[in-house]
């Protein structure tokens, strides 16, 4: 019959074999084809390393089965296995050894059957089919050996539909194991399961004992929407934290995860995404935060300050703010007080229009500073700016924006200083002090950007 052998490089070799061939014979055939000495070959099938003296039939390898070929590292390495009694065993292994192989070596040394062994490394229970390399276990690493309790216990898992599932478990079972048992019973993939006990979400690498889950305890099963995702949180110090979240997580949940990782109390955290401060009760989905999005974490200053906002009618509003408030936040506070929608507000300080995503601190707005509030005419519009390289930039503007303002927006997006920009529309170069309305530039008009030569005139 034919079988296939797949190497780590992705190459697949076809071999003519018989069920009665031994693993030695197969390695000899591989040597004939590929020139790899048998003692450097390890063959894996169904997660198990195949032993030389056994036959293909012993492993139920049938026609068109695929074996995986792993090359042995020249020379192995030593690792240590520490038992709960404090005894340390030394094993000769290779990175490509599977966890099954390691358990077999422990059985050879200590007489403990593999099915009573649990191996833990870096807080994770190791799965039989995986290799030491998969877990980044290197020379002189120490694994911990925990014996399975003979005789488990029953626990209950209650779903949102009200159905209760009974599981046979042991205190030393990890949450991963429990999820696998739920999958066996209910067909729900582990990555769609969330298990809750005593109000806490249970983490995969931990054991039932870690959470003090005892016989006849009840866990609650919540289904994850569409599996989880990773997002990043960048702090002002430049550090980036990675979080495992779901679209349905609330901003409160995210702050709690940041507290778990970094120790920062939620009430001192402000999260910013796309220039907006995120509100506690909302979900990531509400803000269209998707996998691998980056949030910005700003710490609240303890104790805020007062600023003033003066309107064109001469009325002055007093606001309680913090330096880390974004301009969006300030506009929201003005809306609360005056009922003016944020998209109709323009805030001016020191002659500059303030941009939504920036903070008061960015503009050096301090206590008792006065901002000026101008109402926008009929909301804004989009225009396009085309560069000589053919790139098109989209800008949010208003008819009353000056050409200076437009150049500043281009600088924010592209980093080109205004004094190196020339804007052309309808064959005319646009002058800084004029407005878009002066040139009859309307929504979805296209301007052309030409760079000034340095030292030009």
Swiss-Prot record:
Ubiquitin is encoded by 16 different genes. Ubiquitin is generally synthesized as a polyubiquitin precursor with tandem head to tail repeats. Often, there is one to three additional amino acids after the last repeat, removed in the mature protein. Alternatively, ubiquitin extension protein is synthesized as a single copy of ubiquitin fused to a ribosomal protein (either eL40 or eS31) or to a ubiquitin-related protein (either RUB1 or RUB2). Following translation, extension protein is cleaved from ubiquitin. For the sake of clarity sequence features are annotated only for the first chain, and are not repeated for each of the following chains. One of its GO terms (cellular component) is cytosol. One of its GO terms (biological process) is response to salicylic acid. InterPro entries: Ubiquitin-like_dom, Ubiquitin-like_domsf, Ubiquitin_CS, Ubiquitin_dom, Ubiquitin_ubiquitin-like. This is Polyubiquitin 10. The gene is UBQ10. There is a cross-link at residue 76 (Glycyl lysine isopeptide (Gly-Lys) (interchain with K-? in acceptor proteins)). It comes from Arabidopsis thaliana. Ubiquitin exists either covalently attached to another protein, or free (unanchored). When covalently bound, it is conjugated to target proteins via an isopeptide bond either as a monomer (monoubiquitin), a polymer linked via different Lys residues of the ubiquitin (polyubiquitin chains) or a linear polymer linked via the initiator Met of the ubiquitin (linear polyubiquitin chains). One of its GO terms (molecular function) is mRNA binding. Residues 1-76, 77-152, 153-228, 229-304, 305-380, 381-456 form the Ubiquitin-like domain. SUPFAM superfamilies: Ubiquitin-like. Keywords: Cytoplasm, Isopeptide bond, Nucleus, Repeat, Ubl conjugation pathway. It is found in: Cytoplasm; Nucleus.
